[in-house]
Amino acid sequence: EPLDVDRVCLGHRGVWWAEVEVTGRIGHGSMPFLGVNAIRGMADFLALVETELMPRLAERRTRMPCVPDGARQATLNLNSIHGGLAEAVDEGLPAPVVADSCRLVLDRRWLVEEDREAVRAEVIELLDRMKARTAGLDYRVRDLMGFEPTMTEADAPLVATLDHWIHRVLDRPATHI
């Protein structure tokens, strides 16, 4: 384990990176009622994430001996977000349009006690609710990267071998994390 040479990492949380794109209908900025603003749709989704999903994730803890302690819970990080037109560096402000697209990249770390399909489904459920609230909104979810969580039992032969050699070389017992 790179944190300390006397530590044996027994596992890691799973990873699900995904791009969520909310789509609406483009319109002129002076008449936003003729469009469907994807940024507002994403804001609705993010409000559901903050008020409903984040508190649930904070309650989920793994039996794995993770360091630091915060790594023992399921987490969701919002890596990046972009909506509307890009601002033109040399030409001033972007065109006055109702954004028809807003993209978010999320990073969900999940526990060995969780199920891959349930992890994805809880995000989809919030997106479905966002979509149902505003006519003309839709969404796409594109998986970017994913890894299953792993956990090796502390009494596994490989762990016992590492424990033995750490103690022999460093003259101190190994710590399991």
PLM regions and their residue ranges:
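Hydrophobic beta-strand positions in extracellular immunoglobulin-like domains
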Residues: 22, 108-109
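Short amphipathic alpha-helices in soluble, non-transmembrane regions
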Residues: 36, 45, 117-129
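A common structural junction motif
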Residues: 49-54, 124-134
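A generic structural motif
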Residues: 26-27, 110-115
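Short beta-strand/turn micro-motifs at beta-sheet edges
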Residues: 6-10, 89-96
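Fold-level recognition of mixed alpha/beta catalytic cores in primary-metabolism enzymes, strongest
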Residues: 1-53, 70-72, 170
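An extended, acidic, His-containing surface patch that forms the Zn2+-binding/catalytic region
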Residues: 38, 57-88, 138-177
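A conserved active-site cap/scaffold subdomain adjacent to cofactor or substrate pockets
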Residues: 41-44, 97-99, 107
